[in-house]
Amino acid sequence: MRTLRFALVAAALVAGFANASPTDPRVGSEYTVLAAPQPTQAIGKKVEVVEFFAYHCGACNAFEPTLNAWIKKQGDNIVMRRIPLPFQGPSDPEARLFLTLDAMGKLEQYHDRVFRAVHVERKRLMKDDDIIAWAAANGLDKAKFLEAWNSFGVQTKLKRLPAVAEAYKASSTPTVVIDGKYVVSPATVAQSNKIQDMGQLMTATGQVLDALVTKAAQTK
């Protein structure tokens, strides 16, 4: 009986993978659904999209051009939010850098530059002093940067990040959450569709995101 049960489960899994499609994603295959959906900040018929990422994450760096192009294509259909996943806990320097740039109104200008510094220029931005030195060397006023870096607002948001990540069940990067409940990542898309080519994976991930935004919009 145990052997038969195992065979049936295996057959079901194979069938699930065989029917997987990025343009028609299936729950438990390309994406999962949060048991406790999170509140969203979208207004009207717009769909909120949240990306959990880390600057040192190679997969995030590879995903960034695809995600940026996808955001541009979606336009007014979505509200995009990025949340740094604090791998080092409530004092994570990379997350603090992101929050500091956001507080200064410099995030759009510097977000991609941080990725470039880490993955192209091979800068190690994992310690406070290294980050502060990099910021000063890259055109940011050191005094203003430190003011934001040490501000109550940044410190408060930084301390809340682990709880936010736990609420979204985000433990790896990149992870994208659509409408506070649909969770997808390039890794799950690759696994469910047996994709090994990076170009194909980026295309497929974009298709899954498209489908889930459409699905979410239908309930608005």
Map each language-model feature to its residues.
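Solvent-exposed, acidic/flexible segments
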Residues: 45-46, 56-64, 87-94, 103-107, ...
